Every structure is written in C-alpha cells, then in structure tokens.
C-alpha cells in the first residue's frame, strides 16, 4: 500500500513511519509513505505557498499552483514506477466522515494521495481540478490535515496482509463486523478482587466465541445503538443475534 502525502510539515510523519505497527509495516515494505512538500515546487525565493483571501476575512489560503505542481510531481513518480495513480484525497471538515468501511475501500485502491491543508483553507480551484474525495475524522477543527492523514493511514495499514502479528487481529477489531469489540482480559486471573469470566478460562472455543459475540452485541447496543441498526440493515446480524438482543 502506497501513500503520497502533500504536507508543509513532513517531519510529523516520523511518528507513523518509525514506530509501532505502522513503522514495522513500512520497514517491511508492506506500506510506503512518500512525503511531498509544496514549498519544493515554488520557484520564488520565499517559497510562497499561501496568500490573502479574495473578499477579505481572517487567515491565509493555500495557493492552487504549488499544490497542483506537487500533484503533477506525484503522478510523474507513479508513471516512472509503473504505478496507476489512485484517488487524491483532501482532509477537510466538510469531507465524508471516515469509517472502517472507507479504510477497507482505500486498501483496495492500492495507493492514495493525501492533501494536508493548512491555514484557513485551500483554494477552491485546486479542489475542483484535482481532488477526487474529501474525508474528515470528526466534527471538530484541527490545525492541519496531517493528524487526520496519519489517523487514516494507521487504520488502513492495519488491514494490509502481514502488517499485524496475528492475521486475525484486524478482522476482530471494533467495526470490522459492524459492531464494537468484546472485552479483553489477560493475566493475572484475579486483579483487585476482579475476576476473569469463567468462560474464558475453560478452553471451550465455541462457548468463548458465543460469549464474545454476545458481549460485542451488548456493548454495541449500550454504547452505539446506531451501529446495531446499521448492522441489521446490512444483514450482519444472525437470527441468534436478534434473539439475544431481544433478551437484553
């Protein structure tokens, strides 16, 4: 999985490329992150990437030309490597809310280019001419698109085959089956008078699977009932699931 990231702060991405699961995936060439600074595509001595907004108002606007030249550089690198360019994604508050399903869709692209905005906004003409999709990670404002981009890349890289130590880990994450994850326990069996549920100690795999499924349903109904409705609409609930939900 290849990511190309247009950012004024490429140093920020070392947190993703050097540490943890994502860092290991990059070191093993399961994922690659290519960083592109639009200042490198500015011909003027000051490397200007922003200017005042037409019509007035606070803040500066990222200029279309440096961003478009950067995208051209990305596409040229794809062509040189024999890679078909994937979608161009702008991280923006007005974007579609990122979800686990979108993470799976991105994995299918094979490569994705992120535009990490800064300042007040990005010139709309660049968006109209170049951006294929816009994504948001929530209804709040951040200083730039770098943290949302890293959030999305983390979620996608986890899905790359071989990125996780256990091949089943990603499939058992929250949201992968439309529900929240079940509770997890590790040693010791008793901690501050709190016990690990007996069913997890018995070694009966079918009973453990049933317990985990029921706990997942119970937690989802209590904390995110909207996900239950979505799972039901998408045919992800079995007859046994529905019977259990009615018993709660």
UniProtKB/Swiss-Prot annotation:
Top-level taxon of the source organism: Bacteria
Chemical reaction(s) catalysed: guanosine(37) in tRNA + S-adenosyl-L-methionine = N(1)-methylguanosine(37) in tRNA + S-adenosyl-L-homocysteine + H(+)
Pfam families: tRNA_m1G_MT
Transmembrane feature ranges: none
Enzymatic class: transferase
Record Gene3D superfamilies: 3.40.1280.10, tRNA(m1g37)methyltransferase, domain 2 (1.10.1270.20)
GO cellular component, one term: cytosol
MF terms in GO: tRNA (guanine(37)-N1)-methyltransferase activity
Signal peptide stretch: none
Localization (cell): Cytoplasm
Tagged with keyword S-adenosyl-L-methionine: yes
Entry keywords, A to Z: Cytoplasm, Methyltransferase, S-adenosyl-L-methionine, Transferase, tRNA processing
UniProt-listed Enzyme Commission number(s): 2.1.1.228
Biological process terms in GO annotation: tRNA N1-guanine methylation
Entry binding sites for S-adenosyl-L-methionine: 117, 137-142
Primary role: Specifically methylates guanosine-37 in various tRNAs.
NCBIfam families the UniProt entry points to: PRK00026.1, trmD
Subunit structure: Homodimer.
PANTHER family reported in the protein's UniProt record: TRNA (GUANINE-N(1)-)-METHYLTRANSFERASE
Family of this protein: Belongs to the RNA methyltransferase TrmD family.
Protein name: tRNA (guanine-N(1)-)-methyltransferase
UniProt organism field: Polynucleobacter asymbioticus (strain DSM 18221 / CIP 109841 / QLW-P1DMWA-1)
Lineage per the UniProt record: Bacteria, Pseudomonadati, Pseudomonadota, Betaproteobacteria, Burkholderiales
Gene expressing this chain: trmD
């Amino acid at each position: 999985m290849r990511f190309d990231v247009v950012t004024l702060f490429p140093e920020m991405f070392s947190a993703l490329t050097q540490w943890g699961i994502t860092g290991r995936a990059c070191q093993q060439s399961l994922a690659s992150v290519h960083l592109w600074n639009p200042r490198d595509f500015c011909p003027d001595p000051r490397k200007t990437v922003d200017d005042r907004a037409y019509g007035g108002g606070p803040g500066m606007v990222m200029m279309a030309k440096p961003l478009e030249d950067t995208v051209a550089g990305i596409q040229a690198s794809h062509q040189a490597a024999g890679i078909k360019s994937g979608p161009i994604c702008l991280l923006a508050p007005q974007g579609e809310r990122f979800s686990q399903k979108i993470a799976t869709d991105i994995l299918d692209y094979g490569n994705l280019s992120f535009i990490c905005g800064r300042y007040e906004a990005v010139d709309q003409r660049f968006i109209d001419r170049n951006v294929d999709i816009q994504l948001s990670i929530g209804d709040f404002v951040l200083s730039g698109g770098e943290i949302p981009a890293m959030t999305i890349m983390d979620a996608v890289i986890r899905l790359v085959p071989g990125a996780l130590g256990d091949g089943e880990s990603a499939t058992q994450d929250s949201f992968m089956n439309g529900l929240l994850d079940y509770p997890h326990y590790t040693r010791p069996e008793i901690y501050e008078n709190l016990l690990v549920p007996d069913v997890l100690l018995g070694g009966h795999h079918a009973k453990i699977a049933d317990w985990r499924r029921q706990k997942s349903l119970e937690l989802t109904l209590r904390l995110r009932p909207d996900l239950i409705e979505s799972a039901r609409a998408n045919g992800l609930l079995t007859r046994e699931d529905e019977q259990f939900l009615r018993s709660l």
